[in-house]
Amino acid sequence: RPDLRMRNLCAPIRPRTMNLQLSLCTGLVGAAFWCLTVIIGFLIYGGRLGGADPRTVLLMIGNSFVYLIVALSLSFLVSLFIRGGNVQNAVANFLALALSFLGGAFVPLELLGDGILTVSRFTPTFWYTSALEKITALTRYDWAVLAPVVGDILVQLGFAAAFFSVALVLGRLRRQSSSGFAPTATEMNG
């Protein structure tokens, strides 16, 4: 609601602090749901993990946590452009499906054509899937084998940092522009 946004922006805290608080709160909620998902996964598939190396399982969990950070950063960026709840849900579904397809979550990467693979390298899901495939193929855990996995995870963190940085810059530009405070119908003026 625009009136609520305007009321929050005139609070006696700096916009940077407000963004930090919003980001931390979003991160905490995301982490809570991530933990719940991991716990449910262990409850459902725990029996199948009996022979799995715990280091492999921990790397998979860590990779999924990094992807959570990517998803939260992307959602923060998208939320700057879309305000309505229904439209946000539609865009979230579209982005999730598009990134999942391009990143190899629906179709294995080796079945994708060269053109699609080239495009998918520009998505964080590609690097998540790539790291996951490398983690599941691990037979030893020295740096020579782990370096490609760490590289894929760092690329995901780079995407997260880029999304978050762009969101902060666009948020600042939006606050500073006069169109950010265009006449708005509130409860006071109808």
Question: Where do the protein language model's features map onto the residues?
Answer:
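Transmembrane helix boundary and interhelical loop/hinge segments in multi-pass membrane proteins
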Residues: 1-16
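Selective transmembrane-helix segments that form parts of the transport pathway or gating/packing helices
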Residues: 15-45, 61, 65, 69, ...
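Short helix-loop junctions at transmembrane helix boundaries
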Residues: 34-58, 66, 80-85, 105-111, ...
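Hydrophobic alpha-helical transmembrane segments
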Residues: 57-65, 90-94, 119, 150-158
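Hydrophobic alpha-helical transmembrane segments of polytopic membrane proteins
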Residues: 58-85, 100-103, 158-167
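Transmembrane helix segments
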Residues: 85-122
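Short hydrophobic, aromatic-rich alpha-helical segments embedded in or entering the lipid bilayer
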Residues: 109-150
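Alpha-helical transmembrane segments of multi-pass membrane transporters/translocases
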Residues: 134-190
